[in-house]
Amino acid sequence: MKIILLYGGRSAEHDVSLLSAFSVVNAVYYNYYQVQLVMITRDGQWLKGSLLTEAPTSKEVLNLTDSAYQGTPIQPGEIKEEDAIVFPLLHGPNGEDGTIQGFLETIGMPYVGAGVLTSACGMDKIMTKYILQAAGIPQVPYVPVLKNYWKENPKKVFEQCEGSLLYPMFIKPANMGSSVGITKAENREELQNALQEAYRYDTRAIVEQGIEAREIEVAVLGNEDVRTTMPGEIVKDVAFYDYNSKYLDNKIEMQIPAQIPEETQAKAQEFAKKAYTMLGGSGLSRCDFFLTNKNELFLNELNTIPALQAEFCRYP
């Protein structure tokens, strides 16, 4: 059977996608599967690369814009093949948000992972919080802020945020991943700058209460029969980890299993399974939690296409 690995993409997480793709092609059991490389460039061009029958030794093989491994331009619809399945490894907007899933369903091509609605809701931090809060899964206090509302009445936004939350606050674009566009604010001036930064990536932002907490992650796998892994913990040398500390500076590592009480471990797995089920998850996802020193768990987010890079795989 052929796996069509779809990676790259137009989002700010293009490079993360290539790292994930390299991990996947090195994990495939080639006695049973072949891997067809299809890369979406930063400007949206689709390139068809090699058909892999064994694991590549170099990451450069996946960069289909490299002259040594130049891919052949194709139309998106040409990805459709019989006896094949697409594995989308497109992180962030235009990949993890339901757009590519909708396209694949339109052309009748089976794919790995969450469907359109789950992908769209899971990518949108505001929608995720609304749905999972209604399901009884604890969240840190937050305030959603739309760009138009901010432009029309910034003073009211400040009052709303400062009336509901305490500094420090974390400001995030609603539809980005890999900590892109996330800023910590200690005062009103920093809050203003942080919102402006978030609006570079999205017209909707979310302001969250900053808390002192450990960061716990649970991998989820399955469709109707849902399984969870033992929780892992992100151990970091920075106050909070942004894109650089995640992927460039090697300032974090994953400790598996997390050194937490059995009761907390079971609760994290229960919440992860419930979040996955309530959002209609399928294939795989990763649930991220905050854990306070009082052993309180708060859901941070659910990732429907988690990064799988070998150097620091956050899919425990």
Swiss-Prot record:
Disulfide bonds: none
Sites where the protein binds Mg(2+) 1: D288, E301
Binding site for ATP: 162-217
InterPro entries: ATP-grasp, ATP_grasp_subdomain_1, D-Ala_lig_Van_CS, D_ala_D_ala, Dala_Dala_lig_C, Dala_Dala_lig_N, PreATP-grasp_dom_sf
GO cellular component: cytosol
Pathway noted in the entry: Cell wall biogenesis; peptidoglycan biosynthesis
Keywords per UniProt: ATP-binding, Cell shape, Cell wall biogenesis/degradation, Cytoplasm, Ligase, Magnesium, Manganese, Metal-binding, Nucleotide-binding, Peptidoglycan synthesis
Every ATP-grasp domain range: 129-316
Binding site for Mg(2+) 2: E301, N303
Cofactor-binding details, from the entry: Binds 2 magnesium or manganese ions per subunit.
Family note: Belongs to the D-alanine--D-alanine ligase family.
Protein name: D-alanine--D-alanine ligase
